Amino acid sequence: MPATKGKATKRRVKRATKKSGAGATKKINFIPNDPRAVNGPPMRAVAPRPNRTGTVAKFAFQAAPARAGLFEPGTPEFLYWQSREAALAAVEAFEAAAGPLRAWSSFAAQPLPLEPDAGRDLNAYYSRDSVSFFHSVLAGGPTFSGASTDCVAHEVGHAILDALRPDFWTSSLTEHAAFHEAFGDCVAMLTAFNDAETRTAVLAISPNLSKANFLESILEDLAHGVRLVDGVVDGSKPRRSLNKLRWQLPTTLPAELAPGHNPDELTGEVHSFARVFTGCFYDVVRNIFTSRGTLTPAGLLTASRIAGALLAEGARNAVENPRLYEAVGVAMLAADLGMNRGANQLAIVAAFANHGIALAHPARAFQPRARLAGGVAKPKRGAAALSARAVSAELRRRLGATTGTMRVDDFTLGADAASKFVHERSVSLDGLGAALEGVVAPAPEPVVVSRASATAAVALSPIPDSHTTEDEVRYFAMTLLRNGQIGEQQSPRGAARAGGEMLLSAISRGRRGAQGGTTAMPTHVVTSRGAERVLTRVRFACGCSRVAPRTK
């Protein structure tokens, strides 16, 4: 956390200790938002949340001190209790809206380790092996990403979405990766909305949430550090959820912020593009809140939980096509019809429209588009009534897909049963740079299918165009390359593990990377899979700095 707040922090610690008296060891100091949140609630003494028990997703907290206590910011003991409390608060807020989170992704560690300070880096990460936070020594003093509840909740949000939709992990589409980042920011906001003192403070600033405030501003402390280290780049300003950004086709955007440009501008870098969806979600909360007419802290809690539940269902049920923001929005509308009898349809539609995304009614979003072979003459009751083999063969022919897996998932359309066929296309990255010659990257091509007759099926969603898939994947890989997020495989000796793969040394040297250095912990690596070299995700990063971290 910033050294500039040291004196005020010490005064608050002393007052908290005096009030706690004999019970001081049973409480901890906790920053409920970000250390640099302007007008946010101050650090306070709280009783630490208990460990999660039962059949739920759990953490394995690393480097635990002997006991709880009112430790000062900047100490290892404070960082442990702060990051622990923030992580538990994030899951608690999500579950209050969306119900119990029974486990992390089946590909992730159970329990999931949380590292309060994993070394020196201006960043934070979720890999399927851990959520990890770091420290960095800046001109104004040390900063700790684990000291920010915003940052911890964001990374926990990645883990939550990975539990809901593990298939997003392997996708090489910009909007899929950007939605992952947006979901993390949404969980950070849900965590803030779930805190009573925070709700009171934000409504004192903006009674209807229409004015800029600390809650919709994400990662102030890390953004400050990025600006000191990297100058004016993507990530050098806090991400604002109250924004006027409008959706644009990602492949038409610059891959990174041009020198001298304002970080508020939209680029195809995933953290930048994520702000379009966080803007939609914040506006959903705001619209539900104002439409219900109870502009109180209690009313805000209700509105945020309604929006959080819709977001969770939207993420679970969205069709993973390249336009994922729209797909999640349509799935949120469908969830609202089922959960709330459509009470929030206008709030959702208006929120997405405000950011350039037009949502169709769920009943109109899935209409017959193409006849396919694959009906079943005598279907079993309640089944989708499809011949998976026949439909798969037909779709492969139409997709021009001679290779790649074809996954079949159940898909519900109201009271009707359907199936979702998902082909994984491997896209060549030749021509993007020497580091990616001979490398391929995977992307999903989904089609929703239902039975039309005894001999035919019908596609209810557009049949993907392979050229569009290739264009989107190559653009995403290019943004990773430009932003220094691709690594090459090392030998196992000395390498750490992440996401089931060996960590790899950074090799991508984009224009800015050549000037400012590249993170030694990239989000993607090139791995060998049989005879193929495949672009593989190993982690989600906070996206804060391109400067390589030093050792502990």
Predicted features by range, described:
Residues 76-80, 84-149, 161-476, 481-501, ...:
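Zinc-dependent metallohydrolase catalytic domains
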